[in-house]
Amino acid sequence: MPIAGRTHGQHAVPATFGYKPAVWIDEMIRHVERFRQLAPRLFVAMLGGGAGTFASLGGQGPRVQAGMGTILNMLPMTVPARTIGDHLAENICLLGLLAATCGKIAREIYTLMKTEYGEVEEPVPAGTVGSSTMPQKRNPKLCQDIIAASAEVRAAVPLALEAMQTEHEADRTTSLVMETAEARACIATGDMLARLVEVLRGLRLDPVRMRKNLDLGGGLIMAEAVMLDLGATIGRQHAHDVVYDAAQAAFVEGRPFAALLAEDPRITTHLNPPAIEKLLDPTAYTGLCAEIARDAAVRARATAAEIAQESIAD
């Protein structure tokens, strides 16, 4: 499904819609790996007494702590100090990374759902009221919820780092901060993920609008392809200058890019009209988008299957 690839908010080169989820999947798989690595550090048993010194338990302290850990299926802390909070902060930092990806996904869908784009739409059930005064509104409510929740999770990251600044052997002040940060981050993450699942399951794509937007520039999105093909004959830098002139004229004068290319003897000496027309076909210049998307889908299914098995084992 061809779509305009955009960089810095402008048309760049053609891509496929499937390339976008491939990017999201790639990040998500790394998040899964990070949380797997975090688990044994995060879920630990702490029973070292009031100051973490085992003073009240004596020599049996480590064994008692280990026993409690066994019951809870947790590893015992090597140093059961109440001032240690890096593992808790790490959890929030990783939730922040996950939230950043989720927020990015929602923001992309939010943008592509704008009237001026119209390339995708989050699920909008029949009867949904977008506005009490504007009946035509089909607002991206779910994506807005995700973006807001993502911001809340990320905002908890500096709180968690601040909570690591504990004085002496314990301080309720930082404990309160950490508890607040963990609660906010975990609750908002759950809310965010639930809505993201709903969006992705019901996401509607509009290939006709994607193609219409792809053609908005009248072939300008294929300037790189023309430059590279021409560059094989006259040199890349010279080809860049030649195609640049045509592209800028198309912008400034509002003339068709194809016509400007066909009028330039620096181009027509090496490329005939059929060759130029072929080079301006955006569907022929999506690189390895399809392969990347298919590979990402395979890896996503494999990772999902692994997570399902791990859940059963737990």
List PLM regions with ranges:
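Internal glycine-rich alpha/beta core junctions
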Residues: 13-166
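Catalytic-core signal marking the mid-to-C-terminal active-site face
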Residues: 132-314
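Gly/Thr-rich phosphate-binding loop signature of adenosyl cofactor/nucleotide-binding cores
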Residues: 8-12
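Short, flexible active-site-proximal loops enriched in glycine and acidic residues
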Residues: 1-7, 76-77
